[in-house]
Amino acid sequence: MSAAATAGKLGRAPADPGKAPGVAAPGASTAAPPAKEIPEVLVDPRSRRRYLRGRFLGKGGFAKCFEISDADTKEVFAGKIVPKSLLLKPHQKEKMSMEISIHRSLAHQHVVGFHGFFEDNDFVFVVLELCRRRSLLELHKRRKALTEPEARYYLRQIVLGCQYLHGNRVIHRDLKLGNLFLNEDLEVKIGDFGLATKVEYDGERKKTLCGTPNYIAPEVLSKKGHSFEVDVWSIGCIMYTLLVGKPPFETSCLKETYLRIKNNEYSIPKHINPVASSLIKKMLQPDPTARPTIHELLNDEFFTSGYIPARLPITCLTIPPRFSIAPSSLDPSNRKPLTVLNKGMENPMPERPREKEEPVVREASEPVDCHLSDMLQQLHSVNASKPSERGLVRQEEAEDPACIPIFWVSKWVDYSDKYGLGYQLCDNSVGVLFNDSTRLILYSDGDSLQYIERDGSESYLTVSSHPNSLIKKITLLKYFRNYMSEHLLKAGANITPREGDELARLPYLRTWFRTRSAIILHLSNGCVQINFFQDHTKLILCPLMAAVTYIDEKRDFRTYRLSLLEEYGCSKELASRLRYARAMVDKLLSSRSAANRLKASS
């Protein structure tokens, strides 16, 4: 049996690309880089706590963000670091002071944790909760429209966090997907208090607002004075975006967008549940006094009558969950008991999904080529810019860790002369693409199975309970798993299942081929992975994030935005691999077209 294994491990990190996780980066990004080097060890002079600076997480404005760990307790945080040389103007200092002042006064399950701040002669350091699963912005880029139960799950937590803010007289004023962070348990954490303000007395209307919020309310645009209602408007925009897949007033021109907001010009697609449409319309009332208050929202029928999962699996970040086997939110028989269960309870009580096999219907919005055309266009664009032929190449400026892939192939074994290709994903699940074009995946819990027919329909089974027709394939899958455990990786204990995993669906291997130089693997979530045989370098391309992850000979794992590589350039090594990737994606598209022509003629 021939075999080869990929390498590269990766821990996830917080935040929005282009800013620190949980707080705004003040100022504009055009400023010159600071002359001073950020120290490897950050020392809080008051508490004498020492933090070790770790992996780079993102940048934006004047700030850079790193993973930092307490030298004594080993506890890990996100450290936002701002050079004082870029905080020279009084309003810049004042803005940062206000942001810190508001954020440090807050402590809630759905607000990014604030763990302190300090400074030395050159930098201001802010210590924040680490949100390893980034933000709803990255989720939106990968998934576009979510299922209704997922939207309900996230919105409920956003509302709870915002209830706490309003209860403490804080208006956030910039609620948007990129400021709603996710921890390892996919809990929402409201962050970035750079535009937040505190209401000093009842009835106070704020007149000024610096910056340009994404989901700006009409009363802010008209400068008539605004208050807590602007956050409810923003949540209406967020709800629309989560369910429809794009913001309600979005255009390519800012002026046109603002005109649409002023005229309340938006439309809700017909396929959206009327109960959801009704709540969106209530929150997007042009008259702020006509909107529900933050404390009224969770009593709306959208929340009281629909299925709310208690937890969601990590797979939801890239693949829709298994709600085809969960109760429909539109099923009247499910409404009454759920209403009763949700009333007065701190946490929603999920309805147990029916335990039965049921194929998942592929979403209509999914492109036929699984985003290969988009990827080809992105690669054509970056290659045409000749990124390695620059006088000054600044590849590090193109790095964007927020675009790190959720899944990639960590091991593979080719036994296609008899059975198929076996592979392991980075979460330790194992799959086989059989020669008959069916797929079988064993989850990391060692028992759950996902079977994908040739037509893409999916069934969910277990090792202990499955039809006789799958006995041979399950036996082969176990054989592949054992081979990879013994030869290609350190054998590890089974992972303990977590709540929400019963809703998980994993991406699967759509197709693959080998050349003399590499193996090319195309996953169902759109990612293409290329493992080069000679030097063991790897590329993972994601068309939805428009990003590439490059794993070099030293197993160094770095993720870049393709548009930024066009701007800042890259090394000759990466450029040659991107040219190769374009040819391979072209080949994937050509073979897909040929297969479709064959199907049509048969």
Curated annotation (Swiss-Prot):
Native source species: Bos taurus (Bovine)
Protein name: Serine/threonine-protein kinase PLK1
Subcellular location: Nucleus; Chromosome, Centromere, Kinetochore; Cytoplasm, Cytoskeleton, Microtubule organizing center, Centrosome; Cytoplasm, Cytoskeleton, Spindle
Region (Important for interaction with phosphorylated proteins): 536-538
Originating gene: PLK1
Keywords annotated in UniProt: Acetylation, ATP-binding, Cell cycle, Cell division, Centromere, Chromosome, Cytoplasm, Cytoskeleton, Isopeptide bond, Kinase, Kinetochore, Mitosis, Nucleotide-binding, Nucleus, Phosphoprotein, Repeat, Serine/threonine-protein kinase, Transferase, Ubl conjugation
Residue location of crosslink Glycyl lysine isopeptide (Lys-Gly) (interchain with G-Cter in ubiquitin): K19, K490
Function: Serine/threonine-protein kinase that performs several important functions throughout M phase of the cell cycle, including the regulation of centrosome maturation and spindle assembly, the removal of cohesins from chromosome arms, the inactivation of anaphase-promoting complex/cyclosome (APC/C) inhibitors, and the regulation of mitotic exit and cytokinesis. Polo-like kinase proteins act by binding and phosphorylating proteins that are already phosphorylated on a specific motif recognized by the POLO box domains.
Enzyme class: transferase
Positions bearing N-acetylserine: S2
